[in-house]
Amino acid sequence: MILLPQSLFEQIISHARECAPHECCGLVGGNSTTTRTVYPLRNIASEPLVTYEAAPEDLFAAQRAMRQRGEQLLAIYHSHPRSKDPEPSATDVRLAYYPTAVYFIVGLGDREPCLRAFRISDREGRWEPVEYAIAADTNH
């Protein structure tokens, strides 16, 4: 199970809402199963309404910041702005290049946003839900 502090949950939801109707994307860094930092990335996909592609310079800057903070990539997030109960699309599965990362998907298709977590295996072409918990913020 992965722990997501309330403030990071709110940052991810806020990023998804800011980018809507386009998909948002970003990384989550931390240690072990505790997330510490959200790294919003720009979506430069040619069709941002239905897919995402992180801006390479944003991706490199986020990875550099993670190294400097002693963090590892724990999760990748993006949004499905019209989905009430998001699941990985065929494109999400095909482009899942980080098999050890958790993939968070934000659905904004209902009154309240829905955040779900998955492990995705691009080699096997499948995905499975992952449990996560929203934790009270702590001073780290």
PLM segments and residue spans:
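Conserved beta-strand-loop surface patch within small alpha/beta domains used
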Residues: 1-73, 82-140
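Acidic/histidine-rich, metal-coordinating catalytic segments
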Residues: 79
